[in-house]
């Protein structure tokens, strides 16, 4: 039962990566992301990624978007099965970059991620509004800005 579930979960993710590769017009970083990353690097502001994605997907994104230009892939946190919650992942991410969570900015795109960021102690949450829920996001604790693209930062 569990083995079958793992098999189909991995298969689903393989299909996801395949469809991403095939949809070239839509498969790209959010507008302004590269300039934003460049700016963070230039100002020596530490940052990383903490994602619920599995390692295979993280590796795929690092390779596809050349994220290693900005982020050491070894510092990226992903779902390796050891995190009981996204809160723990945020706590580890803050340790990886050496910045206490209350001093971090977390960029999120889901309500559960926003709630976890708040519960982890972050009070500077920026939301990428890919779901057209701006008004809902603006009401959530810790949300300081809702953006459509990184050009809005």
Q: What annotation goes with each model-predicted range?
A:
Residues 51-53:
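Conserved phosphate-coupling serine/threonine residues in phosphotransfer and NTP-handling enzymes
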Residues 18-49, 59:
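Short, acidic loop-to-helix structural element flanking the phosphoryl-transfer center
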Residues 1, 5-9, 58:
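Short amphipathic alpha-helix in the helical subdomain of ABC transporter nucleotide-binding domains
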């Amino acid at each position: 039962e569990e083995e079958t579930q793992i098999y189909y979960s991995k298969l689903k993710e393989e299909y996801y990566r395949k469809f991403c590769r095939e949809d070239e017009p839509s498969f790209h970083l959010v507008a302004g992301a590269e300039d934003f990353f460049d700016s963070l690097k230039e100002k020596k502001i530490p940052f990383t990624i903490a994602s619920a994605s599995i390692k295979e997907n993280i590796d795929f994104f690092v390779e596809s978007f050349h994220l290693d230009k900005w982020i050491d892939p070894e510092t990226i946190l992903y779902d390796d099965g050891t995190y009981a919650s996204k809160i723990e992942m945020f706590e580890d991410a803050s340790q990886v970059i050496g910045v206490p969570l209350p001093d971090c900015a977390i960029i999120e795109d889901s309500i559960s991620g926003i709630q976890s960021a708040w519960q982890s102690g972050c009070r500077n949450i920026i939301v990428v509004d890919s779901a057209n829920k701006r008004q809902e996001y603006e009401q959530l604790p810790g949300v300081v800005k809702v953006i459509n693209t990184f050009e809005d930062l």
